[in-house]
Amino acid sequence: TLIGAAFFFFAGGAFPQTLETPFWKFSLCLVMGLLMLPCPNSLDIRGWGEFNSFNGPQWSLTFEYIGNILYAFIFRRLPKIALAVLCAVCAFFTLDLTMGWDVFGIFPNGPQYTVIGGWSLTAQQIYIGFARLLYPFLCGLLISRILSSRRSESNPSGSPIHLKGGFWWCSLVLVVIFSIPCIGGKTGVADGLYQAICILLVFPLIVLAGSGSITTDKRSTSVCKWLGELSYPLYITHYPIMYMQ
């Protein structure tokens, strides 16, 4: 957020609204951004209607905080069967978006066929944000519970999937998926199905494969350690610079 504030006015060419921002609104948005409080559209100072006009992807961290609060008060107390039921319900929300069902009539302009969104304080964007949060969060929690109950001396991870060189195989699958962000055009049923399969099936399988694989050589271990230490400190720090492109 501070990096975004420092470079905020340098993006005036792409976002003319930034040059007309009064000091009081700039300051208020900065304080709210630092406190991880989402700004309403009336405080949008860039023109994209984001939670945080200085660093748009911060919306994902806001939803992560909501997930942590739900975990602290509700999810951690639930048995595995209840988590499984909730996970199935939230999988439906994901399919509602990716397959364009719009069961609740939230999208008057037509089907989504995608999970893109979640960064504005509108009914549609909040629905997308919670749909993106809940299934992965609950699925990860359910996997953790199941694996912990399966651990043994011969299978310390509890995972049913064990791959030799699992780190490299999982990394390769992720690179392939990220290299193909959509198929059949940017919108449509084919792309929605592709996104649903990745979210609901492929990513959980990658988690299972990763948790069941052990790095035994120094090279893989050092790469894992380096990426792990680098990933969170650098998360979304690049985005303020992208605004200026």
Walk through the language-model features, giving the residues of each.
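Membrane-interface helix-loop-helix regions
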Residues: T1-Y65, T94-A123, C198-S211
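Hydrophobic transmembrane alpha-helices of multi-pass, membrane-embedded glycosylation machinery
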Residues: A6, C90-F92, L142-I143
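Alpha-helical transmembrane segments in multi-pass integral membrane proteins
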Residues: C39-W48, I74-L78, G118-Q245
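Catalytic glutamate of the conserved HExxH
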Residues: Y65, I69-A72, Y239
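A short alpha/beta connector and helix-capping loop motif
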Residues: P79-A84
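Juxtamembrane helix-loop transition sites at the ends of transmembrane segments
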Residues: V85, F93, G100, R150-E153, ...
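Aromatic-anchored segments of alpha-helical transmembrane domains
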Residues: A88-D102, L172-G185
